[in-house]
Amino acid sequence: MPKSEFFREERKRRVALLGEDAVCKLNGVCGYSCGMPPAVEKVSVPADTEEDVYMLIFPYEQFCGEKHFKLYESLKDVSDDELKLRRLERQRETLLASFQQKLKRYDEKIALLSEKFKNLRSKL
């Protein structure tokens, strides 16, 4: 399999597993944070060295490639199950934070209603 095809498949896999984390915070383009920017789609010649691969994947400075290359390298040996577990943990944390915000808003509304009820009682 040519390296370009390998990286294309790897990119798809990482994007699918990482979900929201596969969107670069700097440029908002899906796929960057998994270490595989869209530039890789244009690669048709297999690269022989890691440096060649790096240049094919990150041909432009504005793609914040160094950061994403390091992230990709750090994820390279992580199993799919581990990535799925991380994704589920992030989803749980997001849901918990959302629930806590709603709970706080409800507490504030209850306190406001309680205050209004006290004022109404004092007028009677």
From Swiss-Prot:
One Pfam family matching this protein: Viral_P18
Record-linked InterPro entries: Viral_P18
Origin: domain of life: Viruses
Coiled-coil regions listed: 72-124
Phosphoserine sites (modified residues): 79
Cellular component GO terms, alphabetical: host cell endoplasmic reticulum; host cell plasmodesma
Region Basic motif (BM): start-end pairs: 1-14
Span of the signal peptide: none
Main localisation: host cell
Stretches the record annotates as C-2: 30-68
Family to which the UniProt record says this protein belongs: Belongs to the virgaviridae suppressor of RNA silencing family.
Domain notes: The domains BM and C2 are involved in zinc-binding. Zinc-binding of each of the motifs is critical for the biological activity.
Protein name according to UniProt: Suppressor of RNA silencing
Organism: Peanut clump virus (isolate 87/TGTA2) (PCV)
